[in-house]
């Protein structure tokens, strides 16, 4: 039997319907953020793309753009919305500006639902408040209890 946290149920429900915001899952390292994301990926009925920026080489905005294009292509092919999950996004240089540009350009295009994960809360929150104000909903993942 798999353990499912309440946060998983909340996020799965939110991402299974049209959403006007980017969902952001933040919390300390090793609390289960990636596990929740992978459980969402295997349990929703719409296509999901998962990518992690946890890389030994620095990544830039083209990494985000590549995965966004994958989501758009998948949405056209499947004729359905797509969930794009980007893990450890704070490691990508210029991530918030790039995501803002892509998010704002989606109107009239395929429905891309976005979940971003990050463990460096300060870096995530700075990017969220600077570029993505009004475009996100913050979910906090605490230690297992």
Regions found by a protein language model. Give the residues of each.
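Phosphate-binding site recognition
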Residues: 1-145
């Amino acid at each position: 039997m798999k353990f499912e946290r309440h946060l998983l149920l909340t996020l799965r429900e939110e991402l299974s319907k049209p959403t006007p915001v980017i969902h952001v899952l933040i919390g300390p390292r090793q609390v289960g953020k990636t596990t929740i994301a992978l459980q969402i990926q295997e349990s929703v009925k719409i296509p999901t793309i998962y990518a992690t920026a946890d890389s030994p080489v620095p990544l830039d905005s083209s990494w985000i753009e590549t995965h966004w294009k994958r989501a758009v292509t998948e949405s056209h092919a499947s004729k359905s919305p797509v969930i794009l999950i980007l893990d450890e996004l704070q490691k990508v240089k210029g991530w918030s500006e790039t995501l803002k540009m892509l998010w704002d350009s989606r109107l009239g295009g395929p429905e891309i639902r976005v979940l971003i994960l990050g463990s460096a809360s300060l870096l995530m929150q700075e990017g969220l408040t600077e570029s993505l104000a009004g475009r996100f909903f913050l979910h906090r993942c605490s230690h297992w209890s």
